[in-house]
Amino acid sequence: MKQIYLDNGATSFPKAPGVGQAMKDYIEKVGVNVNRSSYRATAEAALSTLTVREDLCRLFGAGEDPSYAIFTSGVTMSLNMIMKGALHPGDHLIISGMEHNAVARPATQLEAAGVAVSIAPCDGDGVLRLEEFEKLITPKTRLVVMQYASNVSGTIQPMGEIGAICRRHGVLLAVDSAQAAGHFAFDMRKLQIDALCFTGHKGLLGPSGIGGFVMNEEMNKALTPLIAGGTGSMSALLEMPPTLPDRYEAGTPNLPGIMGLGVALRYLQEVGLDALHRREMALTERFLSGLRGNEHIRIPGPADAKGRVGVISVDFLRQDNAEVAFQLEEQYGILTRCGLHCAPLAHKTLGSYPEGTVRFSIGYTTTEEEVDAAIRAIHDLA
């Protein structure tokens, strides 16, 4: 039985061509550190790392200075660094009712430490209610953190309007792009995003364990480094150096991961995000169209592909969703994710809490035949 991978919302598979080989080559043929020594190999590795930073800035529309592209282990660490680095007791934080636990759990920790937290409501499709969101802003509001696209329903937030509201009130905006980066083109400067947190292993088609955030100077001025340690620079200082990116990159970076991510970014440049997005949206619309009219399932989020990415949750009204997910693999070879998807806030907003849903997420290698097979399986099991 052929395996059909529809769990790209958890991690992309397969990775972009050449990612694994680039990582293997670095480990087996290069192996050096960066910013710690002065011989040629380490200088070449540092140059390769700089190129990846430049590619990230270009991809996200972040400006010309690659030092504002910071590497971390992924979007979760990046969000923690932004939220805990920018907020202090007495400050006010706003998140949305669609957030992943990568935002909700740090927010809960901050609330226990004296930061006021508000959850901005969203409509039944998961779209932020802009007027109600703006009314939550107070003189003490320091930071807004929002996901760009939902890992449950695929709902895309109106980030341009959100950015304009934040700028009008002088509030910093940080964005969780885990389900958006690599899926469609956007420009963080035009959207007025102060920090864009990303992960390498989902839409960017890179390896696990590498991600980061790209920020502007306003966010940099607001941040205190969350992690301190060696950087290979200004070693006489017992404080973190003021220069970027070293200020936020204590310890040895994940160099094999960075090299793999670099190959993935070049692949995205060669193929083109617009082409990938058009294909993903066509498959998403095919998927949604094939399920319309089935009264035994419910699909949270926008009714068609417009306004969402290729993440489709299905709530089986007559069956246990966990049992359906098991049968999808056992009978049809279809790999999905079932449950709350680390996003209880989103499921409460969408009306699928506490049961959760079965999530199907489309990738860059997903075919029409695979989508059709999933549609048939859903009808069979519903």
What are these regions (language model features)?
Residues 1-382:
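Pyridoxal 5′-phosphate
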